[in-house]
């Protein structure tokens, strides 16, 4: 299988997000990398589904609550920016304060 660098990065994010989902299901709090991967995956999948940028910017802020992440992670993640492909082209989605307080 010949994957481009971008495809490898997307695959790694998806795997990390899957690990994060399983840890949340076990009641564990997520670290920085897991939290970012989960929110990034939400944006990537939403774009693939054809959702609007504005809708993704809002819904991504509802993926995680502060009680689901380790102490201090919410302050470390002030913005997540994801470049994703929508049906009408590639766009940068910026999610400010992505962890719901």
From Swiss-Prot:
Pathway: Nitrogen metabolism; urea degradation; CO(2) and NH(3) from urea (urease route): step 1/1. GO terms for biological process: urea catabolic process. GO terms for cellular component: cytoplasm. InterPro entries: Urease_gamma (IPR012010), Urease_gamma/gamma-beta_su (IPR002026), Urease_gamma_sf (IPR036463), Urease_subunit (IPR050069). Keywords: Cytoplasm, Hydrolase. It is an enzyme of class 3 (hydrolase). It is found in: Cytoplasm. SUPFAM superfamilies: Urease, gamma-subunit. The keyword ATP-binding does not apply. One of its GO terms (molecular function) is nickel cation binding. The keyword DNA-binding does not apply. Its EC number is 3.5.1.5. NCBIfam families: PRK13241.1, urease_gam. PANTHER family: UREASE. HAMAP family: Urease_gamma. Belongs to the urease gamma subunit family. This is Urease subunit gamma. The gene is ureA.
